Amino acid sequence: MSIKHWMSAPIAVATLFASQLLLAGSVLAAENNDRLDPRNDAFEQKHPDQYHSWKATSESKHIEDALSEDPNMVILWAGYGFAKDYNKARGHFYALDDVRQTLRTGAPADENSGPMPMACWSCKSPDVARVIEERGEDGYFSGKWARLGSEIVNPIGCSDCHDTRSEKFNQGEPELALTRPYVERAFDVIGKNFDDQSRLDKQASVCAQCHVEYYFTGPTKAVKFPWDMGTTVGDMEKYYDALDFKDWTHAVSKAPMLKAQHPGFETWREGIHGKNKVVCVDCHMPKVTKADGTVYTDHKVGNPFDRFEDTCAQCHTQTKEQLRNIVSSRKALVLNMKLTAEKQIVAAHFEAGEAWKAGATEEEMKPILQDIRHAQWRWDYAIASHGVHMHAPEVALEVLGTAVDRAADARTKLVRLLATKGITEPVQIPDISTKAKAQEALGMDMEKMNADKKHFLDTVVPDWDKAAAEREATY
C-alpha cells in the first residue's frame, strides 16, 4: 500500500511543509557557508603573517591636507566635492574611515539624501563584492551613498583581492581574483581577460581594481573604466569627448569638467617599470623572510624605501641614498611642472568667468572651455596618479606639458575674446594663497559643512555600525 492510501490529508500537508522547511534550511545553510566573508579578521588564523602585516597599515594615522599644501586645487575643483577637502591617501586600514569623514560625501540624514552615489563605496571595502553577489550590480549601485551605509563596514582587505572561498586560498596560496564584475569587463575590453593573464599581470590587475581611472555612468551611476578607446590620457580624453561626458560644470568658468580618479595602473603601464613587468607588489608588498625562515608577502602596503633591501635592492645596485636622491629630483621636476600648469589653468578659469560677465556667448566660449577641459583633465590625470614621479616620471612630465599647452591655447583665445568685449587689462585673480581664502573666494560655507559632517558622524554612523555588528553576528 502506498503512503497516499493510508496517510490522512492533514498529516500529508504537515509532512510536506516540514520537509520544505528542512530543505529551505539546508539551502540557507549552504548559502551562508558559501557567502563571501568580508571580515578581514576571519582570515587571521589561516594567514596570520599576511593579516598582521595588513593590520599594520593602521600605523599611517597622520592625515595630510592636500588643499592646504596647494590652494590652487580649490579653484581648479570649484563647484565639485574636491574643493571641500582632499586628503592624501592613508593605509588600507583607514579606507572606510576616510570616505565616511571626508566632506565630499556630505552629511546625509537618511538613505535618500547626500551628494554622492553608492558607487563611492566601490573601492573601499570587500563588502562591496558581497553586496553585488547578493543583490546584483543594479541592487548595489542604485541610490545614494548613504543607502547601504550599514552594509559597507569592513575596510579594504582580504576578500577584495583574493578568492577567499577557494580551496587553494584555504591551503595557503594567494589565489588572486577580480572581485568586481565591472573590472572584469574592463579588462576584457582591452583584450586582457583575467583568467588568461600571467601571474605578474594578475598581480597588477588586482591592484587595478581601484588604482585606476573610472567614472559613473547610467541611471544607477555605476562604475565603468573608460578604456574602450585605449588606456592613455589621450585615448580616454577622446572617449569622454565622444560621450559628451562631464563630471561637473566648473563654478567659475562654466567649463564641462573631467575629474581624474587615480590612474596609477594606466600610468604604470606606460612607464619603465610597467614595460619591464615590475609590478605593484614587487615594490609595495615584497616577499619577506621571517627569523624562522618562513617567507610571506608583506601586506603593509607602503613606501618601498621603508623596506629597501626587500624592494629596490632586489634590482638596483645603487645605494638607498643614491636612489632616494634620484626619486627626489624627479619628484621636484614633476611638482614644478604641476604648479606651472596650475597657474595657467587657474588663470584661464577666472578669465573665462570674466568673459561670461562681459557678455560672451556660448558659441564664443565653446572652444575655450574645451581647451580648459582638456588642460585640467591632463593636469589631473598626472597629479592624481599617486607616485607617478616614481612609476612613470616621463609620462607625468609629458602629460603636464600638454596641460600647459592646452591652457595657453585657452588663454590666447580669451585675450582676443575679452578684447572684443572692451577688456584689455589683465583679469584680477582673488587672494587664493591659502585653502581658507580660496574657499572664501568661492563663497563656500565651510563652517556649516564641517558642523553638518560632525553631526552625521555623531548620529548616523553609530547606527550603521550597530546594525552591521548585529548582522555580522549571524555569520
UniProtKB/Swiss-Prot annotation:
Region described as Disordered: spans on this chain: 38-57
Give me the residues that bind heme c 2, please.
C158, C161, H162, H299
List residues binding heme c 5.
H273, C312, C315, H316
CDD domains assigned: NrfA-like
The lineage is:
Bacteria, Pseudomonadati, Pseudomonadota, Gammaproteobacteria, Vibrionales
Keywords linked to the UniProt accession: Calcium, Electron transport, Heme, Iron, Metal-binding, Oxidoreductase, Periplasm, Signal, Transport
InterPro entries given in the database record: Cyt_c552, Cyt_c_NO2Rdtase_formate-dep, Multihaem_cyt_sf
Residues binding Ca(2+): E213, Y214, K259, Q261
> Which subcellular locations apply to this protein?
Periplasm
Residues involved in heme c 4 binding:
C280, C283, H284, H391
Cite the cofactor comment.
Binds 1 Ca(2+) ion per monomer. Binds 5 heme c groups covalently per monomer.
Q: Which residues bind heme?
A: C120, C123, K124
Q: Does the keyword Lipoprotein apply?
A: no
Q: In which pathway does it act?
A: Nitrogen metabolism; nitrate reduction (assimilation)
EC class name: oxidoreductase
Q: Looking at the UniProt record for this protein, which Gene Ontology cellular component terms does it annotate, in alphabetical order?
A: outer membrane-bounded periplasmic space
| GO molecular function terms attached to this record | calcium ion binding; heme binding; iron ion binding; nitrite reductase (cytochrome, ammonia-forming) activity
Q: What Enzyme Commission number(s) appear in the record?
A: 1.7.2.2
Gene3D superfamilies in alphabetical order: Butyryl-CoA Dehydrogenase, subunit A, domain 3, Flavocytochrome C3, Chain A
What is the name of the protein in this document?
Cytochrome c-552
Family label: Belongs to the cytochrome c-552 family.
